[in-house]
Each structure stands twice: as C-alpha cells, then as structure tokens.
Amino acid sequence: MKSIPTQAQVVIIGGGVIGCSVAYHLTRLGWKDVVLLERKELTCGTTWHAAGLVGQLRATKNMTKLAQYTSELYATLEKETGQATGFKQNGSISVAPDSGRFEELKRGASMAKCFGLEVEVISPRETRELYPLLNIDDLVGAVFLPKDGQTNPIDVTQALAKGAKMGGAKIFENMCVCEIETKNSGTSCARQVSGVKVEVPSLGSGEASELKTISAEIVVNCAGLWGHQVGKMAGVNVPLHAAEHFYIVTENIGLPSTLPVLRDPSSWIYAKEDAGKMLVGCFEPKSKPRPLSTIPEDFSFGQFEEDWEHFEPAMLNAMHRIPKLEDAGIHTFFNGPESFTPDDRYILGEAPELKNFYVAAGLNSIGIQSAGGAGKVLSEWIVNGYPPVDLWDVDIRRFHSFQGNSRYLKERTEESLGLLYAMHWPFRQPETSRGVRKSVLHDRLEKTGACFGEMSGWERANWFAPQRTEARYEYSYARQNWFEASASEHQAAREKVALFDMSSFAKFVVQGRDAEKVLNRICANDVAVPSGKAVYTSWLNERGGIESDLTVTRLHENVFLVVTAGASQIRDLAWLHKNIPDEVHVTVTDVTSGYDVERDGTGIPKFTFKTHSGRFIK
C-alpha cells in the first residue's frame, strides 16, 4: 500500500467521475501536488451504475458549452490515456406526443442552433426511420441531436483517473475522510480549510485503522452521495439528498450498436442500446427519497431492493413507446442511489462559509454528461481564484441554510428527480417544500387574492386573482391566465397607487467608524451621501465585471443599509465579507429576516419619499 503524504496543495474527496475530472483538469493546468482520496474504490458510489448518456443541450448557453466540452473531452480521452471509454456519438431523439411538449422541444432546438449545436426538428415518420422500433401513432414530432452520445461510466472515470496520474496526481483508495480541519484565515471570512483527517486501514488483519492528517491549501468536496455529510464536517451547507433511481436492462434482443439514445419525457423514460440489450430508465414525477441514514456506511457498488410497483407505470409507458419490449426478457432490474439538489442543478464553487473549500456535487443524475465541463471550470476557478465564465446557474452560493434541512430536502427531492423530464413551463413554481419564508404581510396578501411564487424559500405575491377566481397558475407557452390580472395591477400602479412588498430582498446593516470607507472601496458609486439618501450602485470585481447590483442607504453617520436581491443573499454577503480589509473597524449584520422593505407608488402623502431616499416607518 502506498503511504499517504502529510501535505498536499489540493486534496479531493471522492473518486467518482467528477472527482477524477477535477484531478485531471488541475494537472492539465500544471498543478501536480494533487491528492484524491476515495473511501472505497473509484466509481463505487453512484458513478458505476450511471446510464452513461452524454447529451449536449442544457438550459443556458454556458451550461451547454460545458456539456459540449464534456463530449469533446470523452472523444479524445482514449487516445490520450490509452484507456478505452466506450464513447460513441449515435445521436439522441426526444419525442413529443402533444403540442405542448413539441413546442418545448422546438424552442430547445432553436436555442441549440444559437448555441452552435447540430439539431433537426423531425416528423414522426422521420423519427421512425432513425428509430425503427418506435410506436409513432400518437407522436406530434421530435428533435434529433446527431452529436449526442453515450459512454461507459466506469471506463471514462478510469481514463480521467489515469490522465490525472499521468499529470502527477496521486490517487488513494480505501481512505475515508473523517474530519475537515480549519484555521483562522486572518480575514473577515474568519475561517479557511487547512487539511483533512483520514482513516488509513492497517496492514495487519484485525488491527484498528490509523488516523492521519494531510495538510492542504485547498480541499474539494466531490463526495457525491456523501457530499452533504462531508459539507457538515466543514460547517458548509451542501443541500443534496439521495433518491432511488430505477432502470431495467433487457436480455440481448439484437439491437444495432448505432441506435440513437431515445428520450420520451412525457412518458418519463429514456432508452439506450447496451451491447445488444436495451437499458430503459425513468425520471418519474414523484420519486422515492432515500435518507442517507438508511444507506450502509460501507455501501460500495451496491443497490437497493427491487420495487416493481413503483417502476411499473414507467415500464408500461416504455412498452407503449417501444412495443418490442413486451416480448423482451428482463436481464437486470436496477434500483440504486443518485443525489439531487433542491432546484435540479448541480453544486459548484467555493463555499461561502469556508475559504479554499470547494464543492462539486449533486449532479442530479446527469453526472456523466456534466463531469468534463464542471471539472474543467472548477479547476480554473481554483487555480485563478475566480470562475472563467458566469456559473450562477450552479454556484453553491445560490443556496440558503434552510435548504440543508433534512425535512426540506426529503420533501423537495420527491419533486426534483422528475424535473429533468417535467414540462419546463414559463413561470413554473415548485410544488413541494413551500411556505418556508413569509413576509409579515403574507396573510393579508393571501386574503386579497395573491398567487404566490417561490424565490429562495420566500413566498412572494406574483399576481392577484380577480374576485371569485382561484389564485393558481394555468401553465402554457401561450398567454397564461395571469396576463389580464397583471395588466390591471400595472395600470393601478401607473394611475393610482401601489405598495410593493419587497421583504424578500436581502438586507445587510454595515456599521462602524470605517463603514463609509469600506463601502466606497467596494461600491462603484459614491456612498458618501447625507443620512436618508439611497445610492444605486454596482459591486465590481478586479476584472471590471459586475458582481452585484443593489442599493446602499445611509441611515446614520456610521450606519448603512445594503439591500440586494433575495436570490443573491448568500453570494453578496460572502462578497462583502471577502472584500473587507483586516484592519478596519466595521461590522456586518444580516437583517433580512428582521426588516421588511416596502416601496411605494405615488399619491399617499404618508408614504411619499423623495427619489433615492429611505427611512424607517411604523
């Protein structure tokens, strides 16, 4: 057994596809003092049983670019490392049985073209030409992406690991991290990571394992299913939860190796060719969350008990779409864990609670297609100190502490697993884990007919339903049911009076004799204004990019109120702390839950303020 080092520049926790990708990309950037620690064996958690689909189209341009890069990387890994990956680009087909789904697919196809992807909108007949096994009787149309593909998850992970070792990284298996060590950072961030404690198995049988410490400048949490638990060791919120994920593999039915991947999201199913067999999996609308406490500590290459009753509706859908499945024998019924986040987007970046502690976890069952791009940009973030592109979609700082609550996560995971194949309607609102944060005006707004949406846990009145009308969204890609109500509100705000409840906005009190000096250093605009004056400003980074867009109100000589978007509360608070010099006399207090913010229209003298001003009212 190789002896583990006592120090390293970077320690990566977790030997799944994302951990190996981070190690690989760090070495590509010239960092060789990289140590990866895996609790059991590489891929043994969730990577090994992944379906291995490598799609390229995501919801935004930057996420699509990362998925494209993953595909390009997998296409070259075997030549670079000599390790086979099983990667092939047979394309993928997504089918639509109704006009709403087809509209969504066509919108996605238009976006794909803007992002530089090859894509075709095809008829049902053209779909069956590409996929002869398909029942097209109820199809409206489909979208074909010819460069999508699939790979072998274990092989591609081993290729990344081999590439990392070729670049100088050291990989250790059967090394369980049991503690994250921290120290005072000497800045207003207060704490930074300093290393990890590892349980090193003894060489002799029956002997207890030995605890050893590896000092490290940077630690990366790539622990997958155990990412939430590892985050807790460090005092870092990593909101993810396990769920059971199901698929079957048929007996060999002679499928051609060139068959495209099939997705029928309205039926919750996907299918791919697997050595002449067919793998059929599902993302059902209501999943089965699996608390980590029910998963054995030594879980490795494991699976859960079968649940045919839960999988049966998806299987019936699959047999309708692919009639050949009715006569196919079942070789494998698989039920195993995957980890999911509250918004179905993965978690990436430096933790706001702990300097130099990075996270890449919660891949939401698309880890294989995400790992290449996510590993690349996180490595660049680590090396350069900032992300190479806008990664707000997946930034860990978008999450709030309440979202790490086990009850919240369990309830939300019932919904989040199915979001990948749900209809992505404009203004769609979460259905689970609601009512976490409410304004003091919530009850009165509700009685007035408010239809609430959710933003970072806050229940916000998005629009008001007319009397004797239910305050509920009716989703559509056409004009939705709230248009007329919103028009009436808009007219009232212009011609009469309106009071906007902005309690969900984040609020920080910055005070102390150096408060003005600190804020003037951080803000692009001048906050040296009289008391009661509000300043609209940006926070810029050293590259001239905008980090935040907010207002700063001077309440008293040495007291300022910063008001920013609720969604960026954690991000902006972390940025503020990060940029306060050590030697100044200033304190920052998050008063978001303690203060309400109201913004008035015109016409009521009691609430009439001069523009760019503010004061407390009772």
What are these regions (language model features)?
Residues 52-130, 266-271, 275-277, 298, ...:
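Dinucleotide-binding Rossmann-like beta1-alpha1 core, especially the glycine-rich loop
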Residues 21, 180-183, 192-203, 210-307, ...:
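Flavin-dependent oxidoreductases
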Residues 76, 88, 97-174, 178-184, ...:
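Flavin (FAD/FMN) cofactor-binding and adjacent substrate-gating region
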Residues 4-18, 35:
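Beta1/beta-strand and adjacent pyrophosphate-binding region of the FAD-binding site
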Residues 27-47:
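Glycine-rich FAD pyrophosphate-binding loop
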Residues 266, 297, 302-437:
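C-terminal catalytic lobe of FAD-dependent flavoproteins
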Residues 389, 396-618:
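Glycine/proline-enriched, intrinsically flexible loops and inter-domain linkers
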